[in-house]
Amino acid sequence: VITDVNTGEVRALVTYPSYDNNRLSGSADPAYMKQLQEDLSLPLYNNATQAKKAPGSTFKPITAIAGLEEKVIGLYETIDCTGEYKEVDPHIKCWIYPGHHGPLNVVGGLQNSCNYFFAEVAHRLATNRDTLVYSTDMGVDTIRRYASMFGLNRPSGIEIPETTPELTTEDPERSAMGQGTNSYSNVQLSRYV
């Protein structure tokens, strides 16, 4: 999916595998249509608009913005990535584990796509600053609110059928890294990015 960076308008959209449009126009080719319908690679299925998947690290900028706006992190404050985040069970391993990134600020967290950094930001978003009580619901609600600000709570608006996006419903630490139950199509993610 290629979008205009200024407007979000879709400029090009392709899916794979494909099929020969010429064999479906004009006179019908029932044998070819049957072949397409029985093909296990699903060439009639538009992966760009219908296939949903976890956004992964493309979601991390939303978490960074949420952390900064909610003032649970400062622009220059560092979080020390030890390679394994142990505040939740099961523990979350950074992609660099058994190595570690060490101290990172928000820019470093994004540059290194550090799972530990974003798990800690989510944990802070889920912790009441007055009572220091941790609430999964509070963390998830905050992540959902910020994802919605970027339009991830609704279809992209492209003029062909598309799947409905799914905002996370659990596990703020994993959701903050683009895992959890976040689920979006490529066209929805392209409009956000």
Residue ranges and their predicted role:
Residues 3-57, 62-193:
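Beta-lactam-recognizing serine transpeptidase/beta-lactamase-like catalytic domain environment
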